[in-house]
Structure formats: structure tokens, C-alpha cells
Amino acid sequence: MPRVKTGVVRRRRHKKILKLAKGFYSGRRKHYRKAKEQLERSMYYSFRDRKQKKRDFRKLWIIRINAACRLNGMNYSTFINGLSKAGIELDRKILADMAMNDAAAFSAVAASAKAALK
């Protein structure tokens, strides 16, 4: 049986890895082994940070809502409690956007939440 050299297969595999490593720094984009190691690490980071991104945005929305609530004379937890009692089903993303871009509408929502607490 003749000896099979891995020329075409190896070149294809290396090209695939080096193409994915485009934009990496120095030898991490030029050398196959370093590129492969860095690519494995970067895939791990991207998987982990897709989960982290959701938590970070939720934190940011809560901070923005809390700041707007304090301008309306209440804190975040009482505001959320008032919203649930008033039957207002707006998510934190929408509330944070209202707090940043439409303060009058947020004040109206805060007033209705405050009224539901009484």
C-alpha cells in the first residue's frame, strides 16, 4: 500500500485555522500552533461572554431605572413593586430606555406605580 502524505489535508486545515485567526496579534495570526491555541481560548471567551453580556445589560438597566426612580422620589424596589401592583408589564430594557430618552413618560409610569402602592 502506498504511503499517503497529508499535504492537501494539512494545508486546508491550517488555512482554515489561520483564516479564523485573522486580526490576532503577531505570531498568533501567523503561526499555526499559536493561532490554534489562541483561537481555542478566544472561542472559550466568546462563549463565556455571551452569557456575561446578558447579566451586564440587566445590571445597566437596573442602575438607569434606579437613578430615574430616585428623581421621582422612590427607589428601585418600591418602583418595581408598584409596577406589579398596578399591572404594568414593561420589561427593564424598555423602562431603562424610557428613563434615558423619555423622562416625561417615565415620570407618568412612576406616578402610576406610586399610586398603586397607596
Curated annotation (Swiss-Prot):
Pfam families: Ribosomal_L20 (PF00453). The keyword Phosphoprotein does not apply. GO terms for molecular function: rRNA binding; structural constituent of ribosome. Signal peptide: none annotated. Coiled coil: none annotated. Keywords: Ribonucleoprotein, Ribosomal protein, RNA-binding, rRNA-binding. One of its GO terms (cellular component) is ribosome. One of its GO terms (biological process) is ribosomal large subunit assembly. The keyword Protein biosynthesis does not apply. PANTHER family: 39S RIBOSOMAL PROTEIN L20 (PTHR10986). Binds directly to 23S ribosomal RNA and is necessary for the in vitro assembly process of the 50S ribosomal subunit. It is not involved in the protein synthesizing functions of that subunit. Belongs to the bacterial ribosomal protein bL20 family. This is Large ribosomal subunit protein bL20. It comes from Sulfurimonas denitrificans (strain ATCC 33889 / DSM 1251) (Thiomicrospira denitrificans (strain ATCC 33889 / DSM 1251)).
